[in-house]
């Protein structure tokens, strides 16, 4: 389990930090400690650089933002921990996160071999697979899954 270490990554640097993390993962070398990846990867949510003032209405802005972000929102680490603690899964139970992103919930499960996850964002799936190699994580749209 990775420790939760609060990070203050400025909005303007998040895309760069994410790209460095993805490069490190793709390289196959341990360039960045897994715990740092867990605490620093932010995904695409909030990285759109769109300004509401550039749109005729809030609705148009929200639609453009939604299209860019694919609805991505990573549940904060503390909330994931608290939710898993409340559920108290036992190690023999299988757990499915149908929109797992980078796998924040998996960090708190008693048995990573019984963790299953889907996500449509290939970058987030790469991070999740790196952080939780024992989990079963697929890049797919759950609406199309058979």
What role is predicted for each listed range?
Residues 1-146:
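Class I S-adenosyl-L-methionine-dependent methyltransferase catalytic core
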């Amino acid at each position: 389990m990775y420790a939760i270490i609060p990070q203050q990554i400025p909005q303007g640097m998040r895309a760069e930090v994410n790209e460095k993390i993805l490069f490190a993962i793709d390289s196959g070398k341990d360039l960045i400690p897994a715990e740092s990846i867990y605490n620093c990867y932010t995904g695409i949510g909030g990285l759109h650089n769109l300004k509401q003032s550039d749109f005729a209405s809030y609705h148009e802005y929200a639609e453009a933002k939604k299209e860019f972000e694919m609805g991505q929102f990573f549940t904060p680490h503390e909330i994931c921990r608290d939710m898993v603690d409340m559920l108290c899964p036992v190690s023999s139970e299988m757990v499915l996160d149908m929109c797992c992103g980078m796998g924040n919930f998996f960090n708190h499960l008693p048995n990573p071999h019984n963790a299953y996850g889907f996500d449509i964002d290939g970058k987030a799936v790469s991070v999740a697979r790196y952080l939780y190699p024992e989990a079963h994580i697929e890049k797919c749209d759950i609406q199309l899954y058979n």
